[in-house]
Amino acid sequence: MFGKGGLGGLMKQAQQMQEKMQKMQEEIAQLEVTGESGAGLVKITINGAHNCRRIDIDPSLMEDDKEMLEDLIAAAFNDAVRRAEELQKEKMASVTAGMPLPPGMKFPF
């Protein structure tokens, strides 16, 4: 039913994948990703856990419209989150290589 290696082999493979995923999640949490908006006038750096680490606002924007600045900050944050999720997906793909998982499944479970 389970083929060569049986259920024991499948369980061992699942345990190894779980250990690799745990290590990868710890590594991802330490990574930093920077999102930008306004052609780089607003930059937001977040870590892999999506915690904001830094915000850099070009001084020229401090004289401008408050609403525009708020929009640029939101856009930079969203860009940073998108980049962090792409990086996480790439890193996790190396861990799950060879394991049949449903498409679109996000980690952690």
Curated annotation (Swiss-Prot):
The keyword Metal-binding does not apply. It is found in: Cytoplasm, Nucleoid. SUPFAM superfamilies: YbaB-like. Keywords: Cytoplasm, DNA-binding. InterPro entries: YbaB-like_sf, YbaB/EbfC. GO terms for cellular component: bacterial nucleoid; cytosol. It comes from the Bacteria. Its main location: cytoplasm. GO terms for molecular function: DNA binding. The keyword Membrane does not apply. Homodimer. Binds to DNA and alters its conformation. May be involved in regulation of gene expression, nucleoid organization and DNA protection. PANTHER family: NUCLEOID-ASSOCIATED PROTEIN YBAB. Belongs to the YbaB/EbfC family. This is Nucleoid-associated protein HI_0442. It comes from Haemophilus influenzae (strain ATCC 51907 / DSM 11121 / KW20 / Rd).
